[in-house]
Amino acid sequence: MYPLAFAKEGEEVIVKKIDAGCGAMQRLVSMGINIGSKLKVIRNQNGPVIISTKGSNIAIGRGLAMKIMVEDAEYGGENEKL
């Protein structure tokens, strides 16, 4: 497992753990990001991490992206549609 902030552009990952407070968790859930969600990293350079999930692109601040622990979808995920 590693933080979403360390994922490479184009990589598909599965959310395994979220180390965020209640407010941040609610915000992530409202955006469709949960434990088990499959994400594709669109952009990960300076500034927010841009991900795609369930047909939507979402910007996540680097601080929050450090609290979202992920795993490579090829090795440890479900076959959920992006």
From Swiss-Prot:
Give a yes or no for keyword Membrane in this entry. no
One Pfam family hit:
FeoA
Q: TM segments? A: none
Which SMART domains does the entry link to?
Answer: FeoA
Key words of the record: Ion transport, Iron, Iron transport, Transport
Q: Name one GO biological process term.
A: iron ion transport
Against InterPro entries, the record matches this protein to: Fe-transptr_FeoA-like (IPR007167), FeoA-like (IPR053184), FeoA_core_dom (IPR038157), Transcriptional_repressor_C (IPR008988)
Name the Gene Ontology molecular function terms of this record.
Answer: transition metal ion binding
Is Signal tagged as a keyword?
A: no
Query: Can you tell me which family this protein belongs to?
Result: Belongs to the FeoA family.
User: Function, please?
Assistant: Might be involved in Fe(2+) ion uptake.
For this entry, the protein name equals Putative Fe(2+) transport protein A
Species the sequence originates in: Methanocaldococcus jannaschii (strain ATCC 43067 / DSM 2661 / JAL-1 / JCM 10045 / NBRC 100440)
